[in-house]
């Protein structure tokens, strides 16, 4: 296989940490496998000195199969035969399996029983253990505190089941962090209920600025079209002052002056219908009026809820404790335990040194799906320049396990003697229209004024070959539908909505086929 210059650089580069941002269709897997092969065949790094981690067993199995195929193509020397023998037990696995291997080797240092280290909890066992833990935690919690928490949730139409769901969501976040980081995260959340969070105030200011900017742009269109524009120019002046406000307090003061000293936007000006402008202008204005808040009142309000947050975290910690006890009774561990126990063991100097000496090279696939704890696990025993990471933030799919694509983004911005970011931006798989659509689509859904730019220039995919441009360029259609959340059975409403949506897609496919587009050339992503 011939590799492009960027692909070959990713294969050949040595003596540095590498993070590769690889778009879909860029040959990422081929590059990763070829690099692995070259490490074994050219650098003569034994396969048992390489750690390769991915996020699915299938991907790990494919990596092993491709490497075995490459080894079979080589002259069957003693070294090659040795590598083929080592491949079966090589550390090419999911990160969970790697963590489990550490736990099983050093279980007695945690300490847990040998039986517990060998038994992974089934989903049914995990659910039973959690339900029992939750029941025990409620019983151990102060009754008055829990009653107040229930009443607060009930005031928003939430039930005790919703409290349990919140606890599970919090635990998912805590499980993605080390014990120390989890404690800091909880303390920061609790502290945020004692003061006005500067980040929150910045978000609020951005939100209001965006609406003011939209109002100002409408006036820019309208003012040149009307003869007597003085009142609207006054509105524009006040909006300019709002936009120049650098703090929330200043913005609030300026906007209140705007409301007090300007007239409303009329539907008819100079006998001309301006209702479409007026409607849009009013929507933005109303969004500000309805969401503007008094800082002192808001601070008192959040402070009055701090005891509820404290209760929520106290309940979470109790559930976490009882959950561990329930699993210990069953003598099982779950996936979260594997990572936490592995990280705990890697803080032991002897184990850390052993792992450091064992692995000369570390490869991490699907790096965009790494969470904070997994990154800390790798950092616990890696060398200063022996980790090769590859991923694509657009393909991050493990949000439910608290995957954090920002970890990869931060590595991509880190360039020094020990860190080299590389780009594989050429998509060799899709035709040009699909690539262009994806770039446009992701730039819109991943970037917004409040959360900042998540999709950057380095994430843009390019067409790999001229042949992809010469292919028939069928349009890509994005269908967005939403259903009204009216009174009634929500499951039935959603089912009917989905059926209508699928009927619409099916009808559209049939019509396109009648126009001569073959079925194999159409794709509907749902």
Feature locations, PLM:
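P-loop NTPase Walker
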Residues: 1-111, 326-336, 350-353, 395
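Short, polar/flexible loop-turn hinges at active-site or ligand-entry regions and domain interfaces
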Residues: 44-48, 72-89, 106-124, 134-149, ...
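Conserved ATP-driven helicase/translocase motor core recognized via long
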Residues: 49, 164-332, 503, 510
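Helicase-core coupling region on the C-terminal RecA-like lobe
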Residues: 165-168, 423-514, 522
């Amino acid at each position: 296989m011939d590799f492009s210059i960027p692909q070959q650089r990713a294969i050949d580069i040595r003596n540095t940490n590498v993070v590769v941002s690889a778009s879909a269709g860029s040959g990422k897997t081929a590059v990763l496998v070829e690099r692995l092969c070259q490490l074994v065949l050219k650098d003569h790094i034994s396969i048992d000195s390489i750690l390769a981690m991915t996020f699915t067993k299938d991907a790990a199995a494919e990596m092993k199969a491709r490497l075995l195929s490459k080894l079979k193509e080589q002259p069957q020397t003693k070294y090659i035969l040795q590598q083929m023998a080592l491949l079966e037990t090589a550390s090419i696995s999911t990160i969970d399996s790697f963590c489990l291997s550490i736990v099983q080797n050093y279980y007695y240092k945690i300490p847990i029983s040998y039986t517990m280290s060998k038994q992974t909890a089934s989903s049914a066992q995990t659910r039973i253990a959690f339900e029992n833990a939750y029941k025990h935690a409620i019983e151990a919690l102060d009754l008055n505190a829990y009653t107040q928490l229930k009443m607060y949730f009930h005031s928003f139409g939430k039930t005790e089941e919703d409290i349990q769901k919140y606890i599970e969501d919090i635990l998912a976040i805590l499980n993605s962090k080390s014990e120390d980081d989890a404690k800091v995260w909880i303390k920061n959340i609790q502290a945020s209920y004692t003061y006005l969070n500067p980040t929150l105030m910045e978000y609020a200011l951005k939100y209001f600025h965006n609406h003011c900017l939209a109002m100002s742009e409408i006036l820019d269109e309208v003012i040149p079209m009307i003869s007597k524009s003085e009142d609207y120019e006054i509105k524009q002046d006040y909006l300019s002052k709002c936009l120049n406000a650098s703090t929330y307090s200043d913005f609030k003061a300026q906007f209140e002056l705007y409301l007090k000293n300007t007239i409303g936007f009329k539907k008819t000006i100079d006998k001309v219908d301006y209702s479409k402008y007026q409607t849009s202008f009013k929507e933005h204005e109303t969004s500000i009026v309805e969401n503007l808040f008094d800082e002192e009142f808001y601070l008192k309000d959040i402070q009055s809820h701090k005891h509820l947050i404290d209760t929520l975290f106290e309940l979470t910690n109790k559930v976490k404790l009882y959950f561990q006890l329930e699993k210990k009774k069953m003598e099982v561990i779950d996936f979260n335990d594997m990572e936490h126990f592995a990280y705990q063991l890697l803080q032991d100097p002897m184990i850390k040194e052993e792992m450091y000496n064992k692995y000369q090279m570390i490869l991490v696939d699907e790096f965009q799906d790494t969470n904070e704890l997994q990154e800390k696990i790798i950092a616990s025993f890696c060398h200063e320049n022996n980790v090769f990471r590859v991923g694509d933030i657009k393909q991050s799919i493990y949000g439910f396990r608290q995957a954090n694509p920002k970890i990869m983004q931060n590595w991509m911005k880190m360039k020094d003697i020990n860190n080299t970011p590389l780009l594989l931006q050429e998509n060799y798989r899709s035709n040009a229209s699909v690539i262009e659509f994806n770039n446009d689509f992701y730039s819109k859904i991943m970037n917004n004024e409040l959360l900042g730019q998540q999709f950057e220039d380095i994430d843009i995919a390019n067409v790999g070959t001229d042949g992809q441009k010469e292919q028939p360029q069928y349009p890509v259609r994005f269908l967005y539908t939403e259903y009204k959340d009216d009174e009634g059975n929500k499951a039935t409403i959603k089912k009917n909505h989905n059926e209508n949506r699928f009927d619409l897609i099916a009808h559209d496919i049939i019509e396109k086929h009648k126009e001569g587009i073959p079925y194999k050339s159409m794709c509907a992503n749902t």
